[in-house]
A protein has these predicted regions:
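ATP-dependent carboxylate-activation loops
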Residues: 280-301
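Short acidic-hydrophobic, aromatic-tinged amphipathic segments that line or gate anion-handling sites
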Residues: 50-57, 131-135, 164-167
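Phosphate-binding core of ATP-grasp and ATP-grasp-like enzymes
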Residues: 179-184, 191-233, 241-273, 278-287, ...
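Conserved ATP-binding module of the ATP-grasp superfamily
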Residues: 126-128, 145, 149-152, 161-198, ...
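A conserved helix-loop-beta module that forms one wall/lid of the active-site cleft
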Residues: 94-162
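Peripheral (often C-terminal) accessory segments that flank ATP-dependent C-N-forming ligase machineries
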Residues: 301-388
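ATP-binding N-terminal substructure of ATP-dependent carboxylate-amine bond-forming enzymes
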Residues: 1-105, 371-388
Length: 388
């Protein structure tokens, strides 16, 4: 089997996918922008061949690279980056070279919030009213029909970037002034719940869920952006059966194969409202957080299903796993040294956040496990408490 990785060097924690695929005897090929000498030794040794391009954004250059690797190594069986930024490139290359997996047409349902909402409804999962915004007349119609407050996001966009909270007439006017009309927006009724949770996991080549989990955000992505808070989220030991039912129905409706999924929900009392479906793993170091919570190795598990093997099971009970960040320029009540001494049994690893995430999420990320929710909440408080 020939497996082509787009951007095998970045993000660095995803290098482990390449390493584990190679450990399964799969021929792993890479195309990226970094010089070959910059690749880590383990990554270099796991790649059968690496083709450097000047610019991964130049699709013609990338296609020529794929054609060369195809000519030299034979048909390509998989093309994958696992990275939001390159999902469309992955899909167009799959279509051009007749490779298994999501094609550009398949991405429409995960790319546009308006399309996602249609499938959430088909899956029988609660949603809030929404409207596609292309003109100022659409803005006025949404205000009249949906009513304030609303949240405004690009219909095709990721995360909290270019997001507006619309509560007053002034907010509407500000949006109209700031809005580049070439960007289609999607307005939705604002949900007052500050509780966001997820249904995340992995499906095999037949679309069957082989792993699923859930985590809660301590703060919403919008709050992180506005208030520069420390990012904290935690994988839960147990999943609410209702959330599982909704998540499984959504995964079935979207019909993706041999990929990770990351679905976000608002929690409203004892019910949930679907927010968005991400056609890739949760960002940053979240796969490592899943691994610590469930005492397994998802990099290895993914390689196993690509190789046609069973997804490996774990005999260990899940635990809470907290991922909590700190900022280098913030002044905290407790020093890192004190916290790591207090939680030495629970502490797993400290990661330095890549520059791309640091401004929004913090400079350092700490992962800790515990069987106790009470202790986990105490850890969030201790790591996050700042001096007055």
């Amino acid at each position: 089997m020939n497996y082509l990785v787009i951007s095998p060097y970045y993000p660095q924690n995803f290098q482990q996918f390449t390493i584990e695929l190679a450990n399964k005897g799969i021929t792993v090929l890479g195309i990226g922008q970094e010089p070959y000498e910059q690749l880590d030794d383990l990554l270099r040794n796991s790649l059968t061949e690496y083709f450097r391009v000047d610019n991964l954004e130049n699709i013609d250059e990338v296609k020529r690279a794929v054609a060369f690797l195809f000519y030299k190594h034979g048909p390509i069986d998989r093309i994958e980056s696992h990275n939001e930024y390159w999902l469309e490139l992955d899909a167009s290359l799959r279509e051009q070279f007749h490779v298994f997996g999501a094609k550009p047409e398949d991405l429409k349902k995960t790319k546009f919030k308006s399309e996602m909402k249609k499938l959430f409804k088909k899956a029988g999962v609660p949603v809030v009213p929404g409207a596609v915004i292309k003109t100022e007349a659409d803005v006025n119609q949404a205000v009249n029909e949906i009513g304030l407050p609303m949240i405004a996001k690009p219909d095709n966009g990721v995360g909290a970037a270019a997001t507006f909270k619309l509560e007053t007439e002034d907010d509407i006017n500000h949006f109209k002034q700031e809005w580049e009309h070439s960007t289609v927006y999607f307005f939705e009724k604002f949900v007052t719940s500050s509780e966001i949770c997820t249904f995340d996991g992995l499906v095999d080549k037949d679309g069957k869920i082989v792993f699923s989990t859930t985590f809660d955000y301590a703060y919403t992505p919008l709050d992180l952006m506005i208030y520069k808070m420390d990012n904290s989220y935690y994988v839960l030991k147990d999943m609410d059966p209702k959330l599982r039912k909704y998540g499984e129905a959504i995964v079935k409706e979207f019909g993706m194969k041999e990929r990770f999924f990351h679905i976000e929900f608002f929690r409203e009392g004892d019910d949930y409202i679907a927010i968005e479906y991400n056609n890739r793993p949760a960002g940053g170091f979240t796969i490592d957080v899943y691994n610590f919570a469930h005492s397994l190795d998802l990099y290895r598990g993914y390689a196993a299903i690509v190789a046609g093997e069973e997804f490996p099971v774990t005999d260990f009970e899940p635990q809470y796993c907290l991922a909590t960040s700190r900022r280098a320029n913030a002044h905290y009540v407790y020093s890192e040294e004190d916290l790591l001494a207090k939680y030495s049994q629970q502490f797993k690893v400290k990661k330095i956040m890549p520059a791309a995430f640091a401004e929004l999420q913090g400079d350092y990320l700490y992962m800790l496990t515990t069987p106790s929710r009470q202790e986990m909440e105490q850890m969030i408080a201790d790591f996050g408490q700042r001096k007055e």
